[in-house]
Amino acid sequence: KGDTGWLIIDPLTGEETSRLAMELVKKHLGDHPVKAVILSHSHIDHFGGIFGVASREDIESGKIDVYAPEGFFDHSISENVMAGNAMSRRATYMYGNLLQKGTKGSYGSGLGTTSADATPGIIEPTYLISDREGETKTIDGIKVEFIYTPESEAPAEMMFYFPEFKAMCQSENISHTLHNLY
């Protein structure tokens, strides 16, 4: 939480699931407005839930800022819309979406329990991060050090560090699953 509201990182895959997550946050952590959203990279499971945490109107008016790596929108469209049908068919096999749930069918996708069945959304970011040497922004009172890492785990990707909290989000650049190899 920032000085006046929430800073959301990667709002899940779809609007319905991210909206339910925000309801839990408000119930247990306080009903504060969303001030900014950080989209770490161009894979739909990290940005598709944008409209569950922020409205298009609030983003377009500048009420809520959206930070993403340079190339985010174009790479998201090319991978998730233009290649979406092929990727969806691949996911059916890869995640076992058509298998019966349970120990004799599917009990997980490897990355999680299953892929989301929710409405994805996308919007052009209001701020693009493009400096490979790093750039620092203060978002609602929170200092964030961004590092642009294109063509890593995704075509458009970035990592970021919160020095006040000694916390780093490496997106999916540092991962033990090597999930893009299968």
Which residues make up each language-model segment?
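Core dinuclear metal-dependent hydrolase active-site scaffold
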Residues: 1, 128-167, 174
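Conserved beta-strand hairpin/beta-sheet module of binuclear metal-dependent hydrolase folds
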Residues: 1-29, 157-172
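Active-site metal-binding motif and surrounding structural segment of the metallo-beta-lactamase
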Residues: 4-5, 15-65, 130
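Active-site environment of divalent metal-dependent phosphoester hydrolases
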Residues: 42-48, 73-75, 153-155, 175-178
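Residues that flank catalytic or metal-binding motifs in active/ligand-binding sites
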Residues: 62, 123-125, 133, 156, ...
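Generic beta-sheet signal
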Residues: 67-69, 170
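Metallo-beta-lactamase
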Residues: 74-149
